[in-house]
């Protein structure tokens, strides 16, 4: 992509309305723009990141055997009345009437609707297990939306729902999804800690939250110091990780620790995923019954699995940034390479830049080619801000000798590379 043809409305100054780093950087780098309190338009750069995260999550759900569906944003209120949640959910639920006076709502979650789909289409234990997921926009009318997309009113979620004949099988499915979550966050290039947690309004009695460590996190989590080894050794077996202690603040009890208090550390975390074993709460209330192997009608056992796709964008930035801007993990970066031509009027610079651009594009490496008239200092500031993992810098002096500079955004290390060797280094 040529920067001269791209839509990248960067801001030089910090926006006064932004409180946390991710919100500031998302506005400054031209990823989003606010349309109303807690509601944002995703501009090209931000949407690329959002789609990259979405695709990685989708891949891991598919690997876990989950099947993708797409449920509507707008839900009939009678399903929520039937499940018993309509009056209990509170003012966060946006409700309205259509022209026929039917009460509808903008779905904040989908347990009720997926239970309705299940009960009308699956009747026998022979059709189990089933695990269905969708990626859809949700709305919760937060009383005080803040921190940009971290706590907005409109947000993109991946929600999965599993159905099993009994608790034993349901827990097996839950454990499979736990592993899928660990793998998904690894693939996203983030360090997420699974902690024992409360189920909240969803219900149920088995639950884990997944937190990314960040100083701006709203929750305090307590965890075994072994988790810190995940940063340097991401290939640790998931079963081993599952045996390590980690708990949300409301579940942390010093006198009931399975390991010594000295082995525990605490950090602020941003919750980016939550999985629940719900049991038969919804199936009982909504009469979602199936025939078991003895022909007896029995309520289905359910679990729910959520990942905040749009929130992840902000959380990843909080954990991967410096004073200059964003430092994207390669897996989610909107562009893997920023190609910076410092003098677009120098024929040799143009020759090397176009050569590199073609080679990168031919290898399906996403590259943003800065072919603008901006000054070198402005170009460096822009590309440090948007956070491409690698920068190829082409200036007249080195270009004369077929040399380009390759900068690693995370370490800041710059090395001179002969242009013909560029692809082997990248």
Curated annotation (Swiss-Prot):
User: Example GO biological process term?
Assistant: prolyl-tRNA aminoacylation
Q: Name one GO molecular function term.
A: ATP binding
Tell me the domain of life: Bacteria
Annotated localization: Cytoplasm
Do you know which CDD domains this protein is assigned to?
A: ProRS_anticodon_short (cd00861), ProRS_core_prok (cd00779)
Q: What is its EC number?
A: 6.1.1.15
Q: Hey, which family's this protein in?
A: Belongs to the class-II aminoacyl-tRNA synthetase family. ProS type 2 subfamily.
- Species name for this entry? Rickettsia peacockii (strain Rustic)
Output the Pfam families linked to this UniProt entry. Answer: HGTP_anticodon (PF03129), tRNA-synt_2b (PF00587)
Query: Which HAMAP family is this protein grouped with?
Result: Pro_tRNA_synth_type2
The protein's name: Proline--tRNA ligase
Reaction equations catalysed: tRNA(Pro) + L-proline + ATP = L-prolyl-tRNA(Pro) + AMP + diphosphate
- Outline the subunit composition: Homodimer.
């Amino acid at each position: 992509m040529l920067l001269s043809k791209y839509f990248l409305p960067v801001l030089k100054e910090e926006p006064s309305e932004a409180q946390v780093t991710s919100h500031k950087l998302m506005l400054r780098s031209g990823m989003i723009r606010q349309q109303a309190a807690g509601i944002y338009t995703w501009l090209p750069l931000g949407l690329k990141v959002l789609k990259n995260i979405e695709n990685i999550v989708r891949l891991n759900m598919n690997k876990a055997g989950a099947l993708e569906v797409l449920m509507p944003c707008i839900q009939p209120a009678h399903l929520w009345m039937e499940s018993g949640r309509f009056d209990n959910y509170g003012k966060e639920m946006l409700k309205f009437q259509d022209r026929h006076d039917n009460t509808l709502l903008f779905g904040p979650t989908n347990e009720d609707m997926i239970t309705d789909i299940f009960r009308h289409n699956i009747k026998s234990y022979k059709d189990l297990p089933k695990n269905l997921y969708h990626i859809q926009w949700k709305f919760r009318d937060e009383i005080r939306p803040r921190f940009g997309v971290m706590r907005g009113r409109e947000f993109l979620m991946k929600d999965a729902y599993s159905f099993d004949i009994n608790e034993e099988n349901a827990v097996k499915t839950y454990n499979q999804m736990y592993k899928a979550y660990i793998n998904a966050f690894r693939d996203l290039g983030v360090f997420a800690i699974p902690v024992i947690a409360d189920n909240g309004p969803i219900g149920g009695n088995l639950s884990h939250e997944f937190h990314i460590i960040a100083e701006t996190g709203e929750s305090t989590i307590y965890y075994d110091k072994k988790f810190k080894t995940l940063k340097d050794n991401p290939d640790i077996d998931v079963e081993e990780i599952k045996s390590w202690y980690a708990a949300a603040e409301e579940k942390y009890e010093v006198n009931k620790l399975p390991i010594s208090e000295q082995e525990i550390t605490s950090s602020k975390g941003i919750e980016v995923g939550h999985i629940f074993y719900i049991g038969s709460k919804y199936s009982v209330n909504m009469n979602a019954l199936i025939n078991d192997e003895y022909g007896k009608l029995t309520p289905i056992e359910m679990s729910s699995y959520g990942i905040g796709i749009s929130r992840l964008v902000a959380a990843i930035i909080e954990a991967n940034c410096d004073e200059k801007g964003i430092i994207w993990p390669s897996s989610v970066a909107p562009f893997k390479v920023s190609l910076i031509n410092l003098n677009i009027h120098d024929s040799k610079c143009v020759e090397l830049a176009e050569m590199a651009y073609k080679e990168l594009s031919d290898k399906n490496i996403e590259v943003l080619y800065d072919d603008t008239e901006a000054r070198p200092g402005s170009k460096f500031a822009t590309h440090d801000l948007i956070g491409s993992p690698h920068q190829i810098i082409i200036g007249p002096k080195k270009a004369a000798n077929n040399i380009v500079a390759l900068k690693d955004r995370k370490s800041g290390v710059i090395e001179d590379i002969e242009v013909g060797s560029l692809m082997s280094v990248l």
